[in-house]
Amino acid sequence: MLTVISPAKTLDYDTPPVTERFTLPQYLDDSQALIQQLRELSPAQISELMHLSDKLAGLNAARFGSWTPDFTPANAKQALLAFKGDVYTGLDAESLAEDDFSYAQDHLRMLSGLYGLLRPLDLMQPYRLEMGTKLANARGKDLYAFWGTRISEWLNEALAEQGDDVLLNLASNEYFSAVKRSALKARVINVDFKDLKNGQYKIISFYAKKARGMMSRFVIQQRISDPEQLKQFDVQGYYYSAEQSKPDHLVFLRDHPAD
């Protein structure tokens, strides 16, 4: 089983990585093509394109300018440790053991507007490029057109390497839309996390994002290989709802948020 999650806007390049192991991103030719195009934009154009403040637009213009195809631990960091935000708070990669990183490397992928698809230990230079960005390019009107069926094909390869065909989707709609289902040779398992609020179970963004990270960690630490085993997920008060679930759409409920 292969799990996919979204990246995060918030990055941490200050905290030293908890593992010295690293790999290199596999699709840097595509990343470099995007970087070359992004370098042609002024900070004001970046601000308009990405709906960023002037300060953040300037920061990312500088990031695009300093980006290099030569990745080292001095200018980059393992993706799973560089991303922060709600999903990654739930995943808490800093406390994973070395053998957990080994398992994650084979069974977890992060979708990315700039890098396409990242493995946990792939070095990543800092960037901001959300998948939904309407960046017209040589392949089409936006990043979905740029990546085309590539991400699906790479996921197919990763699944074939582990002799499986189950893809656990813990990514947002914005990012999973970059996976072309028609080109994907996999059974996709979707998951919803709902919290009780005002007498009804609802998807609350902050809690749902954190829960996606917690389930990713659960899969890694428990070495989950069968979707049926996902029903055992019971972290921080969540429990499986057979009534609300379908075979390929699992629903977990929580009556009292843990925080």
UniProtKB/Swiss-Prot annotation:
Xref: Pfam families: H2O2_YaaD
Signal sequence residues: none
A biological process from GO: response to hydroperoxide
GO CC, one annotated term: cytosol
Similarity field: Belongs to the UPF0246 family.
PANTHER family: PEROXIDE STRESS RESISTANCE PROTEIN YAAA, PEROXIDE STRESS RESPONSE PROTEIN YAAA
Protein name: UPF0246 protein PputGB1_4560
